[in-house]
């Protein structure tokens, strides 16, 4: 267990600024109780039991003016998130009252916390490792219940345990190899060492490669699928967007060229966050504003993870339709044949067979879009296996890929008959890379950069 480090006492508002039922101002540090007590009228906070909530008032110690009626939570080290003394002042929600209390605490000796500093202290004091700290932010940013499930498992230590167990096995292997090198007098020691190294390296590589296979699904659930809705003007793109969102975000008219910009919204499709991009209809136009929208649409198409191409079933294919079919053919594409509630005139024989006939007006077959997304990105395997550990963070994925490369270097060296003591270098490098994931071997600059992405008060 890490020994709690000595820091100054920090404070910040932990709830979003604005009107609300409750606001929370948090303190953490050695002097948290004394500073809170200096502005609190009620029980002596320095004498109350840990993990209790205490009623009272916040007052200005200079004037005696009551600032607010509050409930104050007292949590004593080390059984707190930061492993320091923590005080949370529960106020009435609102910008003025929370800011006033924050300024009082700063005047009484607390320092304004940096973004993510509470979680950073939890990391530095050994309460969480780096993957668990990152999971805190993932929980805050989760857009679906599936994304939250993955983040909660990571916070619970599932990824940490896997990485730490693997690092320990690598360390055990390195120790055994070192012992064998130190006792070369046995005739078969070199052969035994090579066999051990080959077996364990392949075992480690297989484990990490299996973990990498979860990255595609995990990253999608964490970051969402960038989804471009494309089609020529007035085929129903904006109506589809509104249908998926179940609210009117896009202008819907019979006038071609109404959507002149790119509209972005998130929607939860069976646990998958889709970043829906409703693009301006792609067509040749002399309207300068519309031209800009069309160019942005083409860019959105190029960058999209998923393309929803909308065609009009009540009209024959146009040159614009054919151009869009060609433009999107190399994408992860779902072709949607809209307006099937009208008389059908489109030439089906000229279209791929896996299209989905829909009617945005009557909500026909919208559920089939969700099923097709599952087929395209998850091979019908479902989204989240309850006991599985997923990679979802780009930093983790990159480091696991580097670790696999180091293990491949060991295997290549074994195949070439390189001396075992040279191969130890690459295996040791694998151990170090995995340590960067949990923070055991992460540089200070990386740690500072990661926590700077957190919000104030967390």
From Swiss-Prot:
Mg(2+) binds at residues 238, 259. It is an enzyme of class 3 (hydrolase). InterPro entries: G_TrmE, GTP-bd, GTP-bd_TrmE_N, GTPase_MnmE, MnmE_dom2, MnmE_helical, P-loop_NTPase, Small_GTP-bd. Its EC number is 3.6.-.-. GO terms for molecular function: GTP binding; GTPase activity; metal ion binding. CDD domains: trmE, TrmE_N. It is found in: Cytoplasm. The keyword tRNA processing applies. It holds the Pfam family TrmE_N. Residues 224-378 form the TrmE-type G domain. One of its GO terms (cellular component) is cytosol. Its cofactor is K(+). (6S)-5-formyl-5,6,7,8-tetrahydrofolate binds at residues 26, 88, 127, 458. Binds 1 potassium ion per subunit. The keyword Magnesium applies. Exhibits a very high intrinsic GTPase hydrolysis rate. Involved in the addition of a carboxymethylaminomethyl (cmnm) group at the wobble position (U34) of certain tRNAs, forming tRNA-cmnm(5)s(2)U34. Belongs to the TRAFAC class TrmE-Era-EngA-EngB-Septin-like GTPase superfamily. TrmE GTPase family. Homodimer. Heterotetramer of two MnmE and two MnmG subunits. This is tRNA modification GTPase MnmE. It comes from Streptococcus pyogenes serotype M12 (strain MGAS9429).
């Amino acid at each position: 267990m890490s020994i709690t480090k000595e820091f100054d006492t920090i404070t910040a508002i932990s709830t979003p600024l604005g009107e609300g039922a409750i606001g929370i101002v948090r303190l953490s540090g050695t002097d948290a109780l004394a500073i809170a007590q200096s502005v609190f009228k009620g029980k002596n906070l320095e004498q109350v039991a840990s993990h209790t909530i205490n009623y009272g008032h916040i007052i200005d110690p200079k004037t005696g003016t009551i600032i607010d009626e509050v409930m104050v939570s007292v949590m004593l080290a080390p059984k707190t998130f930061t492993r320091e003394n923590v005080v949370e002042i529960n106020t009435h929600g609102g910008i003025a009252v929370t800011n006033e209390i924050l300024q009082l605490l700063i005047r009484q000796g607390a320092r304004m916390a940096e973004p993510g500093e509470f979680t950073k202290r939890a990391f530095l004091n050994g309460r969480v490792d780096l993957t668990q700290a990152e999971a805190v932010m993932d929980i805050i940013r989760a857009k679906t219940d599936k994304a939250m499930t993955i983040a909660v498992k990571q916070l619970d230590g599932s990824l940490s345990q896997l990485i730490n167990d693997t690092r320990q096995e690598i360390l055990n292997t390195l120790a055994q190899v070192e012992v064998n090198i130190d006792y070369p007098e046995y005739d078969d020691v070199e052969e035994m060492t090579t066999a051990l190294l080959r077996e364990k390296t392949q075992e480690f590589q297989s484990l990490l490669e299996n973990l990498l296979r979860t990255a595609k699904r995990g990253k999608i659930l964490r970051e969402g699928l960038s989804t471009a809705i494309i089609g020529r003007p007035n085929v129903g793109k904006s109506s589809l967007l509104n249908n998926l969102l179940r609210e009117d975000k896009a202008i819907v008219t019979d006038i071609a060229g109404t959507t002149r910009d790119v509209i972005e919204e998130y929607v939860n499709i069976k646990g998958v966050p889709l970043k829906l991009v409703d693009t301006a209809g792609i067509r040749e136009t002399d309207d300068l504003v519309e031209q800009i929208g069309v160019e942005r649409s083409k860019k959105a198409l190029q960058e999209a993870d998923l393309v929803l191409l909308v065609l009009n079933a009540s009209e024959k294919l146009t040159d614009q339709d054919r151009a869009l079919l060609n433009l999107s053919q190399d994408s992860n594409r779902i072709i949607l044949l809209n307006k099937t509630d009208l008389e059908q005139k489109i030439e089906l024989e000229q279209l791929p067979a896996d299209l989905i006939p829909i009617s945005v007006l009557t909500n026909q077959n919208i559920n089939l879009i969700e099923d097709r997304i599952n087929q395209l990105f998850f091979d019908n395997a479902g989204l989240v296996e309850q006991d599985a550990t997923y990679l979802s963070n780009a930093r983790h994925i990159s480091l696991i890929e580097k670790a696999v490369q180091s293990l491949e270097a060991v295997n290549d060296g074994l195949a070439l008959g390189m001396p075992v003591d040279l191969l130890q270098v690459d295996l040791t490098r694998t151990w170090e890379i995995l340590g960067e994931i949990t923070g055991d071997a992460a540089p200070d600059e990386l740690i500072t950069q990661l926590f700077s992405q957190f919000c104030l008060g967390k």
